[in-house]
Amino acid sequence: MKKILSALLLIFVMLLSACGGVKYELKDGLMFADGKEATGNFEFKTGKYKVKGNFVNGLPDGLFEEYYEDGSIMAKETFVNGEMTSKELYYKNGNLLGNFAENGDIKLYYDDGSLILSYDAEKEEYTYYHENGNPFMIGNSNETTLYNENNEVVSKLRDDDLTDIGATLKKLDDGTFELVKGNEVIAKIDANDEIINYLYSTGEPLLKVNESTGETEFFFKNGNTFMKGKEGGSILNYRDGKPLYEINGDSETIYNEEGDKIVGGFDLVTDIKKLD
């Protein structure tokens, strides 16, 4: 009888142990199973979003997919031996929001597929775009050129100095100035020579530069802020003025058109499950 009870007790203990299962933990970018580096396909949550991906000896390796709450794809990231080599971000409608390539090239898109900005890593050159697809601003380490919506140059900096673009500075009776190119006013300058407003061809504000504060603000033709920069950071917006891409010091944040923060990395990980 005692042997039977002992055997039943042993089986009960073994069942309890089995019910406990393996303890998975994602720590400092490494996946562990009962304290040992794990290998396999896993599913987990970062904040409110589900993530699926493969780990080899604890390190992320291969394709990782992150999903919105409705199940649509939010991000695809490719890892090789723990290092992320490329990333694609998506709107909820399935259109591409951003592409961060292995060679360092970057492209960001509106949800209709038109380009917002591109960065050529080889040339170390960035291009921002008007809503009609023409370049808004092209810049590199030596030169920055600003265009209106008709692809006409309204300002050019070379080595931080303004260059001659064939424009004439005209002083008005109230002490302010106008910068005229051909028959078109391309910029207005206040009497203190501190604030300059570059203009679209139809007169709307294009870029405001405040020399006293160092702030710059770019505008869509509808008057909403396209991009705003100041010391230590900048923010790039959607057409309706909502934030799309924000830089604050060393941190970067990307938002979809509904204002949802697109989470990258493995922060706030919960609900880890091994799929195979």
For each predicted feature, which ranges?
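Sec-dependent signal peptide recognition
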Residues: 2-10
